[in-house]
């Protein structure tokens, strides 16, 4: 019997977008009701995806600016990033390309990214938007466009509260590592060299 392959999966994104809730929902099938800012927490789960057993190491990171110098320490050895934003926070959506992509490309330039839109249950919650005037939800089309813009391997929307698509997020991360997408071929037209003798 072969040992399960270890995959290090690191969650990244602004504070309070639901990274920790997503991990807890996935590993324990529960939804925490209190917000507790994260420093670093690690979870581990043995998972079977498409007949492959993997030991999925889940690393949670803090999105707050106070941890900007500490957070990148968790990036070493990462196999995949779950880059999360809240579907009800335009600021967290915009920070994906303003803050998080530059940080990830600096510290881990070749690690694949799965883009995750969290709090899917609130996007259609009319009462939530009545209680929070001025907020506008992020659409699936906007998420797909951001995926293309940053070159993410996948984009998934989920709700940790209802558990909708939570398993799909982690299955997708595992599949990206086990079967990485083929890099797009650049248009390589033969260029002729000009030599001056």
Swiss-Prot record:
Q: Which residues form a coiled coil?
A: none
Q: Which GO terms describe its cellular component?
A: cell projection; cytoplasmic vesicle; cytoskeleton; plasma membrane
Main location as per UniProt: cytoplasm
What are the Cysteine methyl ester sites (modified residues) in this protein? Answer: 194
Entry annotated with the keyword Cytoplasm: yes
Keyword list (alphabetical) reads: Cytoplasm, GTP-binding, Lipoprotein, Membrane, Methylation, Nucleotide-binding, Prenylation
- Motif Effector region, chain ranges: 35-43
Localized where?
Answer: Cytoplasm; Membrane
One Pfam family linked to the record: Ras
Work out whether the entry's keyword set contains Nucleotide-binding.
yes
Which ranges of residues are annotated as propeptide in this record? Answer: 195-197
Q: How does it sit in the membrane?
A: Peripheral membrane protein
Q: Annotated Gene Ontology MF terms?
A: GTP binding; GTPase activity; protein kinase binding
Q: Where, by residue number, does GTP bind? A: 13-20, 60-64, 118-121
Which domain of life does the protein's organism represent? Eukaryota
Q: Name one GO biological process term.
A: regulation of cell shape
Lipid moiety-binding region for S-geranylgeranyl cysteine? 194
Q: What does this protein do?
A: Inactive GDP-bound Rho GTPases reside in the cytosol, are found in a complex with Rho GDP-dissociation inhibitors (Rho GDIs), and are released from the GDI protein in order to translocate to membranes upon activation.
Q: Which PANTHER family match?
A: RHO FAMILY GTPASE
Which family does the similarity line name?
A: Belongs to the small GTPase superfamily. Rho family.
Classification via NCBIfam families: small_GTP
UniProt-recorded name of the protein = Rac-like GTP-binding protein 7
This protein's encoding gene: RAC7
